[in-house]
């Protein structure tokens, strides 16, 4: 877990929690970066051509890539970048802790790394159902899609 400058960031238990709720096919490493809203806005503009901040960005790894220090075949699922300011505001709005919001966002981002896309026309609520099942497994009362009313 790093900040936007690559320095270690503190989000105690987040990686372990995500690993405990992840679907079986989520094999490999997920790099999670906690970044400022301004940094996430820059990334959102650069990679999605949207000049606004967002809560979490997902960057899937190329197939076959391996994370540093991992055995061949273990692989890298990809990177998640979470906007800390947005996460804090959303936590307050949802009446739960910042740590809980980080879990909500990390789970949502992981599903995007696995190829789910709730904005796709052919999704038909599939990502929302998977997110709901996994968040219940992890003890979360609501997921990002459910909160957004999608």
Where are these regions (language model features)?
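An acidic/histidine-cluster motif and surrounding catalytic segment
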Residues: 1-103, 113-150
């Amino acid at each position: 877990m790093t900040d936007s400058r690559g320095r270690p960031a503190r989000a105690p238990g987040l990686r372990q929690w995500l690993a405990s709720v992840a679907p079986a096919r989520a094999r490999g490493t997920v790099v999670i970066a906690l970044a400022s809203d301004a940094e996430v806005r820059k990334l959102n503009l650069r990679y999605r051509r949207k000049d606004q901040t967002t809560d979490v960005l997902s960057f899937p790894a190329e197939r076959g890539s391996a994370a540093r220090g991992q055995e061949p075949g273990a692989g890298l699922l990809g990177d998640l970048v979470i906007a800390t300011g947005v996460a804090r505001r959303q936590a307050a709005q949802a009446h739960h802790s910042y740590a809980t919001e980080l879990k909500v966002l990390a789970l949502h981002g992981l599903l995007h790394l696995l190829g789910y896309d709730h904005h796709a026309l052919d999704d038909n609520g599939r990502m929302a159902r998977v997110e709901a099942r996994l968040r219940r497994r992890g003890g979360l009362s609501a997921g990002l899609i459910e909160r957004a009313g999608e």
